[in-house]
């Protein structure tokens, strides 16, 4: 019993040393508000399919920050326009007028050398 009473007295001392804050007064008008604005989030219904190590298919759906989503969209639009422009250049045929006159001259000299 004496041991139980000593444990109780120790816990009572700890409670006495840690008083609870019981301030019911409203916050003052000049107190600093350290809260930050809430970031807007968007729910994406699109699933990202990932194959797990165990062979199960996992679809991730969920929330994404609006600013991150908009940044990714701008980035994808930018890269899509770059890819489209580079494809046009790569698939375009070279016009004969675009050829260098020196290259044409060398080709003619090479053909003339083969004929003689």
UniProtKB/Swiss-Prot annotation:
Residues 1-40, 70-116 are annotated as: Disordered. Residues 1-15 have a biased composition (Low complexity). It is found in: Nucleus. Residues 84-108 have a biased composition (Basic and acidic residues). Keywords: Nucleus. One of its GO terms (biological process) is DNA repair. GO terms for cellular component: Ino80 complex; nucleus. The keyword rRNA-binding does not apply. Component of the chromatin-remodeling INO80 complex, at least composed of ARP4, ARP5, ARP8, RVB1, RVB2, TAF14, NHP10, IES1, IES3, IES4, IES6, ACT1, IES2, IES5 and INO80. Present with 538 molecules/cell in log phase SD medium. This is Ino eighty subunit 4. It comes from Saccharomyces cerevisiae (strain ATCC 204508 / S288c) (Baker's yeast). The lineage of its organism: Eukaryota, Fungi, Dikarya, Ascomycota, Saccharomycotina. The gene is IES4.
